[in-house]
């Protein structure tokens, strides 16, 4: 097929999609995308697990009367970091329990939630906006349970990584020590580009749930650890390269990217020493960096700096 014909066909397909979207209507298009992106599974799966032993189960009430279901596991170590875990698409807390258990086995305190539409949370079709609201409510609970910001960490896997980045980018968010993003993507538009028909013009204009992490990362200054398996067949691991590159305001020694050789989309957390050494070193260094930032910003140090000048 001549190049001009191929170009015309691409434009024609793009125009057809735009016309179809207009016919279907924005409301239906939005609902379809939300269902496709979050894909919450409501049927019990044989491999789902109960929460780790000693976990508290409770609900967090939202201002509109909805609720999000939460699990909290308290480490026996008094100085352990406390991690807010934001899971990805499809699986609820029971489907993600293996990931939480991997962290609690290493005695990290952990708070995990189901977005609305998942598990025992209020049944509704989730969206980027509602997931963001749920994460904000969960972080408020994290602050209540962990008053020391040096020990607060945000951790998101896959879609949860995008939710975590959005949460961390909020200007009114209470302080935290660091952000951990695992197996996540640059944006929904970026993910469309990896699909068979991702070249079709106009697709990005149809996205109602952008989850655009790149611009948000460009505003962050707190330490960030990106983790990705090189055998991920859901989200290309190169997307973590782009996420890492976007976090330009983070100090170079506190902006880290770890690739887990041979790990799939969900198995990095099970990969052993490479993963857990990266996490342990990061949480230690981010905690120390927070302390130093606060020491440098103290009134006494500021006064000494002015006098020295």
Residues covered by each model-derived region:
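An N-terminal hydrophobic leader/cap segment in hydrolases
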Residues: 21-61
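Membrane-embedded segments
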Residues: 63, 67-141, 145
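Short alpha-helix in the alpha/beta-hydrolase fold that links the catalytic acid
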Residues: 99, 222, 236-246
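Alpha/beta-hydrolase fold nucleophile elbow
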Residues: 146-158
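Hydrolase active-site cap/lid region
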Residues: 163-216, 222, 270
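Short beta-strand/loop motif that positions the catalytic acidic residue
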Residues: 220, 226-228, 232
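Acidic catalytic loop of the alpha/beta-hydrolase fold
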Residues: 231-235, 265-266
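C-terminal catalytic histidine-bearing segment of alpha/beta-hydrolase fold enzymes
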Residues: 242, 249-309
């Amino acid at each position: 097929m001549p190049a001009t014909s191929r170009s015309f066909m691409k434009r024609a397909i793009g125009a057809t999609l735009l016309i179809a979207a207009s016919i279907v209507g924005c409301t239906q298009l939005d609902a379809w995308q939300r269902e496709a992106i979050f894909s919450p599974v409501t049927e019990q799966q044989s491999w789902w697990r109960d929460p780790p032993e000693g976990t508290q189960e409770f609900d967090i009430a939202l201002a509109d009367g909805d609720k999000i279901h939460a699990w909290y596991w308290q480490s026996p170590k008094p100085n352990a970091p406390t991690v807010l875990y934001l899971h990805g698409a499809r699986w609820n807390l029971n489907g993600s329990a293996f990931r939480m258990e991997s962290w609690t086995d290493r005695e990290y305190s952990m708070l995990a939630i189901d977005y609305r539409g998942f598990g025992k949370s209020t049944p509704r079709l989730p969206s980027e906006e509602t997931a963001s609201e749920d994460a904000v409510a969960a972080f408020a609970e994290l602050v209540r349970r962990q008053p020391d910001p040096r020990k607060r960490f945000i951790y998101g896997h896959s879609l949860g990584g995008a939710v975590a980045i959005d949460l961390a980018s909020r200007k009114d968010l209470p302080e935290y020590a660091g952000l951990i993003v695992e197996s996540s993507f640059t944006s929904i538009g970026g993910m469309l580009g990896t699909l068979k028909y991702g070249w079709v013009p106009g697709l990005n204009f149809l996205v109602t749930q952008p989850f655009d992490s790149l611009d948000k990362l460009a505003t962050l200054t707190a330490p960030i650890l990106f983790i990705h398996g090189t055998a991920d067949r859901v989200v290309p691991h190169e997307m973590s390269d782009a996420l890492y590159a976007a976090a330009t305001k983070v100090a170079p020694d506190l902006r880290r990217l770890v690739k887990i050789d041979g790990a799939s989309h969900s198995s990095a957390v099970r990969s052993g020493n490479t993963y857990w050494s990266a996490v342990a070193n990061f949480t230690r260094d981010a905690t120390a960096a927070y302390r130093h930032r606060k020491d440098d910003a103290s009134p006494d140090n500021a006064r000494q700096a002015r006098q020295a000048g």
